[in-house]
């Protein structure tokens, strides 16, 4: 299941803002960067009506895998897990989430990835237990 367009982070100014103004949560396989949404940055975007929505981007380095097929499979796996659990929780806050996957051999194991993804989601307070 793909992310809805209203939930996608776009634009280099958005990512610069997240890198500078975010809370960071570290795991062995990935890093979460969470920042409160800033509508001033998104004024130039077409989805201006969805400024206060929760937005997410998952960045997977080529260090994880040189093959785009593998990186896209991991990205879709994490997006799917997030959407299934995010829709259950009705208490959405206007945050921006950037997930950076680190290079590791254990990225081939879906269960470890999902387990750490879930751990960081709860650790960051995005979803409740």
UniProtKB/Swiss-Prot annotation:
Highest taxon in the source lineage: Bacteria
A GO biological process held by the record: tRNA 5'-leader removal
Enzyme class label: hydrolase
Function: RNaseP catalyzes the removal of the 5'-leader sequence from pre-tRNA to produce the mature 5'-terminus. It can also cleave other RNA substrates such as 4.5S RNA. The protein component plays an auxiliary but essential role in vivo by binding to the 5'-leader sequence and broadening the substrate specificity of the ribozyme.
The family this protein is said to belong to: Belongs to the RnpA family.
Keywords: Endonuclease, Hydrolase, Nuclease, RNA-binding, tRNA processing
Name of the protein described by the UniProt record: Ribonuclease P protein component
Record-level GO cellular component terms: ribonuclease P complex
Keyword RNA-binding: yes
Oligomer and partners: Consists of a catalytic RNA component (M1 or rnpB) and a protein subunit.
Its EC number(s): 3.1.26.5
Keyword tRNA processing annotated: yes
Gene: rnpA
Stored Pfam families: Ribonuclease_P
GO molecular function, one term: tRNA binding
Gene3D superfamilies: 3.30.230.10
NCBIfam families: rnpA
Catalysed reaction equations from the record: Endonucleolytic cleavage of RNA, removing 5'-extranucleotides from tRNA precursor
């Amino acid at each position: 299941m793909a992310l809805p367009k209203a939930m996608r982070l776009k634009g280099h100014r958005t990512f610069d803002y997240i890198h500078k103004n975010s809370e960071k949560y570290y795991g062995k396989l990935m890093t979460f960067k969470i920042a409160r949404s800033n509508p001033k940055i998104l004024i130039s975007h077409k989805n201006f009506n969805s400024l206060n929505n929760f937005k997410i981007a998952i960045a997977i380095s080529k260090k994880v895998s040189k093959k785009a097929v593998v990186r896209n499979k991991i990205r879709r796996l994490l997006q799917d897990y997030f959407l299934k659990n995010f829709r259950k929780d009705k208490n959405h806050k206007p945050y921006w989430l950037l997930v950076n996957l680190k290079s590791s051999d254990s990225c081939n194991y879906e269960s470890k990835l999902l387990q750490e993804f879930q751990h960081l989601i709860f650790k960051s307070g995005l979803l409740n237990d």
